[in-house]
Regions:
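Short, low-complexity disordered leader/linker segments with a strong preference
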Residues: 1-41, 332-341
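Pocket-lining segment of extracytoplasmic ligand-binding domains
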Residues: 97, 173-267
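Short amphipathic alpha-helical segments at helix boundaries and their inter-helical linkers
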Residues: 185-188, 284-300, 325-335
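Secondary-structure end/capping motifs
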Residues: 236-312
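Short polybasic/polar patches that bind polyanions
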Residues: 63, 103, 159, 203, ...
Length: 341
């Protein structure tokens, strides 16, 4: 597993600190946003994808509550899941299927606390080779990464549109998203089931396009990108710090919603990408803290019905997702935040 550690005082562009409030956003009148009397150190898993770009600001916002965040960079959500389940991390954001996959393997130490948004995952074809409807998928060679949220959305869309996934020309792509682009350019595949910034790279380089069809609007999964989750041991021992983390997260998402272009620049800097690529990736993403429990249950059922997990955990997932911290941080009801949606 390839990880890179960053210090708790992550440096950001000067413009960010100039715009950031110097005190917690809701002021001292809200008990959930008061500064902790003693500092609490936290390890946060971070994957460098555009949908998670607001989380680059989490250390800076959490520091206002006396929570000291150290970010650890991961290349794959699966590795973040393993680290959070084991307690090597206290907080992480990964695919909405990851807590379910953990439960299927007997890991009960991860608790989902907030949503991240929608979009981000994408389909990509060579320019001029559009796929206008799902019937047009059948003859194509399709590059996928089994287990990824983009793959899950695609597999659900295939079923909902009357195709037999088992009869498709599936090509398993190993490694990172760059390998999908190489395979697509090299005509080893005709469609990549991938995610940003890799779609954005193909688009801005001029050789690729999005097909007319999309896999981000299925009844089973919807457009969910990721879930923010806590390690249960950390959550139980440090509930007040956990609340401050979620409150800080809500604050940074509000900043991202207000100024997506600013976050495109942050993402470009952190990922070492051209700003045009980052801007295209962010354009495809909608930041949102709500978390649809119905979608999570639908994902669990889909994974079981299709043999990805050996045990049906759809009836258990609710107890591994809590709206307590998010409701306090936003002042909204759990039902409004997705518990009944």
């Amino acid at each position: 597993m390839n990880v890179r550690r960053l210090g708790p005082t992550l440096a950001l562009l000067a413009v960010l600190s100039a715009a950031a409030p110097s005190t917690p956003a809701a002021g001292q009148s809200d008990p959930s946003r008061t500064r902790l009397a003693a500092p609490v150190k936290v390890k946060q898993g971070m994957a460098n994808v555009p949908a998670l770009s607001p989380l680059w600001l989490l250390p800076e916002e959490a520091a206002k509550y006396n929570v000291q965040v150290e970010q650890v960079i991961f290349q794959r959500f699966a590795d973040e899941r393993t680290a959070l389940a084991s307690g090597d991390l206290d907080i992480a954001a990964f695919g909405p299927q990851d807590i379910i996959l953990g439960l299927g393997q007997g890991a009960k130490s991860m608790i989902g606390v907030a949503g991240v948004g929608s979009g981000n995952d994408c389909l990509l074809v060579r320019k001029g080779e559009d796929v206008r409807d799902w019937a047009g998928v059948a003859p194509k060679r399709i590059g996928i990464g089994a287990g990824s949220i983009s793959w899950l959305k695609f597999a659900a869309a295939v079923q909902e549109n009357g195709l037999d996934y088992g009869k498709l020309r599936i090509v398993n792509i190993m490694g990172g998203g760059g390998n999908y682009l190489k395979s697509l350019q090299g005509k080893e595949i005709d469609m990549a089931v991938v995610w940003h910034p890799f779609c954005a790279q193909g688009i801005t380089e001029g050789w690729a396009q999005y097909p007319t069809i999309t896999h981000n609007a299925t009844k089973t999964v919807g457009g969910l990108i990721a879930v923010l989750a806590l390690n249960r041991g950390f959550m139980d021992k440090q509930r007040e710090a956990a609340q401050r983390l979620v409150s800080a997260y809500v604050d940074v998402v509000k900043i991202a919603q207000a100024d997506p272009q600013r976050f495109a620049k942050i993402y470009a800097e952190k990922a070492g990408l051209p700003e045009a690529v980052a801007a295209e990736a962010i354009r495809y993403t909608r930041f949102d803290v709500t978390l649809s429990l119905a979608s999570i249950k639908g994902i669990a059922k889909f994974l079981f019905d299709n043999g990805v997990i050996a045990r049906d955990v759809a009836g258990e997932v609710e107890q591994y997702h809590t709206y307590e911290f998010l409701a306090r941080a936003t002042g909204r009801s759990a039902a409004d935040l997705g518990q009944s949606k």
